Amino acid sequence: MGAQAPLRLPAAPPLAVCGYTSVLLLFAFCLPGSRASNQPAGGGGDCPGGRGKSNCSELNLRESDIRVCDESSCKYGGVCKEDGDGLKCACQFQCHTNYIPVCGSNGDTYQNECFLRRAACKHQKDITVVARGPCYSDNGSGSGEGEEEGSGAGAHRKHSKCGPCKYKAECDEDAENVGCVCNIDCSGYSFNPVCASDGSSYNNPCFVREASCIKQEQIDIRHLGHCTDTDDVSLLGKKDDGLQYRPDVKDAGDEREDVYIGSHMPCPENLNGYCIHGKCEFIYSTQKASCRCESGYTGQHCEKTDFSILYVVPSRQKLTHVLIAAIIGAVQIAIIVAIVMCITRKCPKNNRGRRQKQNLGHFTSDTSSRMV
């Protein structure tokens, strides 16, 4: 037998081949997951376990929040705490309100050291205490030597050797013992004893300034005359000598860290109960505690009853009540006066009629016959 020729199928028409190809391509594109396989990883496809692009963005935000709060990004006493679905760096500082000012390395004055640490945590910046007491502006015309520490307007001037000299002290770099030198001469002042905030008596106010300059600490005049046993040093705060410069106290209690400047401050905790019937306030200018007494009380500690309260002009809140009471009283008085006037006018007429009837009843028969 001879070799058989291979079986050949009849050639398909060209139109049929094109039709089959187009159907296969259309079927391939319509298969589920085909579009996802064509898109790059991480592209705008559906998130695993999610419901769309919105869930993708939320997931990314959550992951970014978790990555942000860690030991490297939440420092200076901050604690990572849950805030909704993410984590947040929280600065939990319970600061007291006592006025013990400190100067920060950023040039800002803070009410006390706790407020400084809270500001460092809030801004995540390294803020340290450069000096005890408020920051002072350098108003002198010095030579400009030395570095300016901090960016604030009231920054300390850091000298090359001495450090910050305060209370009118000058840096003497040529001296053997480099330090702050006080050139205050009190020889021309007369004897005028005063009591200072450190509990010591000085012959005149100039010696108080000299002692403050030498000790490089704030010493203020409390009152004229020598100190007595009743003087309490703890009642005093610290302020600048001569009140030529009032520092700006940074309070991190609100979002803007507004500057706390004012002539009155809340009294410290050791003065609780200082005012019996009133509010205790610490006056910055005099560095003394005072009482704002309630209505009806007077005295240094609001312990006395004010008997002249009826003659005191009422406050705005009570003025409306006083006016209403006055109007009601005036109306009542007017009604009473009207009633009294009506009664007094009717009474004489009634009396006259009664008298006439009584006179007619007294006539006898003889008098009546005579009249006839």
Swiss-Prot record:
<keyword id="KW-0217">Developmental protein</keyword>
<feature type="signal peptide">
    <location>
        <begin position="1"/>
        <end position="36"/>
    </location>
</feature>
<dbReference type="GO" id="GO:0141069">
    <property type="term" value="F:receptor ligand inhibitor activity"/>
</dbReference>
<keyword id="KW-0472">Membrane</keyword>
<feature type="region of interest" description="Disordered">
    <location>
        <begin position="139"/>
        <end position="161"/>
    </location>
</feature>
<feature type="site" description="Reactive bond">
    <location>
        <begin position="97"/>
        <end position="98"/>
    </location>
</feature>
<comment type="similarity">
    <text>Belongs to the tomoregulin family.</text>
</comment>
<keyword id="KW-1015">Disulfide bond</keyword>
<comment type="subunit">
    <text>May interact with ST14.</text>
</comment>
<feature type="glycosylation site" description="N-linked (GlcNAc...) asparagine">
    <location>
        <position position="139"/>
    </location>
</feature>
<comment type="function">
    <text>Neuron-specific restriction factor that prevents herpes simplex virus 1 (HHV-1) infection in the brain by blocking viral entry. Also able to restrict herpes simplex virus 2 (HHV-2) infection, although to a lesser extent. Acts by preventing the association between the viral glycoprotein D (gD) and its cell surface receptor NECTIN1, thereby inhibiting fusion of the virus and the cell membrane. Also able to prevent the association between the viral glycoprotein B (gB) and MYH9/NMMHC-IIA and MYH10/NMMHC-IIB receptors.</text>
</comment>
<feature type="site" description="Reactive bond">
    <location>
        <begin position="188"/>
        <end position="189"/>
    </location>
</feature>
<feature type="glycosylation site" description="N-linked (GlcNAc...) asparagine">
    <location>
        <position position="55"/>
    </location>
</feature>
<feature type="disulfide bond">
    <location>
        <begin position="91"/>
        <end position="121"/>
    </location>
</feature>
<feature type="disulfide bond">
    <location>
        <begin position="267"/>
        <end position="280"/>
    </location>
</feature>
<keyword id="KW-1133">Transmembrane helix</keyword>
<feature type="topological domain" description="Extracellular">
    <location>
        <begin position="37"/>
        <end position="322"/>
    </location>
</feature>
<feature type="disulfide bond">
    <location>
        <begin position="182"/>
        <end position="213"/>
    </location>
</feature>
<feature type="disulfide bond">
    <location>
        <begin position="195"/>
        <end position="227"/>
    </location>
</feature>
<dbReference type="GO" id="GO:0046597">
    <property type="term" value="P:host-mediated suppression of symbiont invasion"/>
</dbReference>
<feature type="disulfide bond">
    <location>
        <begin position="103"/>
        <end position="135"/>
    </location>
</feature>
<keyword id="KW-1003">Cell membrane</keyword>
<feature type="disulfide bond">
    <location>
        <begin position="95"/>
        <end position="114"/>
    </location>
</feature>
<dbReference type="InterPro" id="IPR002350">
    <property type="entry name" value="Kazal_dom"/>
</dbReference>
<dbReference type="InterPro" id="IPR036058">
    <property type="entry name" value="Kazal_dom_sf"/>
</dbReference>
<keyword id="KW-0812">Transmembrane</keyword>
<dbReference type="Pfam" id="PF07648">
    <property type="entry name" value="Kazal_2"/>
</dbReference>
<keyword id="KW-0732">Signal</keyword>
<feature type="compositionally biased region" description="Polar residues">
    <location>
        <begin position="358"/>
        <end position="372"/>
    </location>
</feature>
<keyword id="KW-0245">EGF-like domain</keyword>
<feature type="disulfide bond">
    <location>
        <begin position="293"/>
        <end position="302"/>
    </location>
</feature>
<feature type="region of interest" description="Disordered">
    <location>
        <begin position="351"/>
        <end position="372"/>
    </location>
</feature>
<dbReference type="InterPro" id="IPR000742">
    <property type="entry name" value="EGF-like_dom"/>
</dbReference>
<feature type="topological domain" description="Cytoplasmic">
    <location>
        <begin position="344"/>
        <end position="372"/>
    </location>
</feature>
<dbReference type="GO" id="GO:0005886">
    <property type="term" value="C:plasma membrane"/>
</dbReference>
<keyword id="KW-0325">Glycoprotein</keyword>
<feature type="disulfide bond">
    <location>
        <begin position="275"/>
        <end position="291"/>
    </location>
</feature>
<feature type="disulfide bond">
    <location>
        <begin position="186"/>
        <end position="206"/>
    </location>
</feature>
<protein>
    <recommendedName>
        <fullName>Tomoregulin-1</fullName>
    </recommendedName>
</protein>
<feature type="domain" description="EGF-like">
    <location>
        <begin position="263"/>
        <end position="303"/>
    </location>
</feature>
<keyword id="KW-0677">Repeat</keyword>
<feature type="domain" description="Kazal-like 1">
    <location>
        <begin position="90"/>
        <end position="137"/>
    </location>
</feature>
